[in-house]
């Protein structure tokens, strides 16, 4: 994926609810370090039981499935977002999310 394009997509599609900064939660949890992390594990964020109990590790395949249709992949998630249908857009956003780490 194209991380630069993914950053722009993140800013237009995700940044209203998610921070890309370490330790900064918003309506949704911070997505800093999301790649490789287990769902429902950001300190200080009040997750839905569905997300806490899902125990999904956020990697290429799981992020694609979640971003395509969050409520189908994790029924009961608090994420009020219809999803991203275009595979290229998901690939680029995931490429950007991989850069959000120490």
From Swiss-Prot:
GO cellular component: mitochondrial intermembrane space
Predominant subcellular localization, coarse grouping: mitochondrion
Transmembrane region(s): none
Region annotation Disordered: where it falls in the sequence: 1-25
Gene3D superfamilies in alphabetical order: Cytochrome c-like domain (1.10.760.10)
Residues bearing PTM N6,N6,N6-trimethyllysine: 85
Keywords: Acetylation, Electron transport, Heme, Iron, Metal-binding, Methylation, Mitochondrion, Respiratory chain, Transport
Entry-linked SUPFAM superfamilies: Cytochrome c (SSF46626)
Binding-site residues, heme c: 17-18, 79
PTM text: Binds 1 heme c group covalently per subunit.
Cellular compartments annotated: Mitochondrion intermembrane space
Gene Ontology molecular function terms on file: electron transfer activity; heme binding; metal ion binding
Record-listed N-acetylglycine modification sites: 1
Taxonomy, superkingdom: Eukaryota
Feature: compositional bias, Basic and acidic residues: 1-11
Entry similarity comment: Belongs to the cytochrome c family.
Task performed by this protein: Electron carrier protein. The oxidized form of the cytochrome c heme group can accept an electron from the heme group of the cytochrome c1 subunit of cytochrome reductase. Cytochrome c then transfers this electron to the cytochrome oxidase complex, the final protein carrier in the mitochondrial electron-transport chain.
Protein name listed in UniProt: Cytochrome c
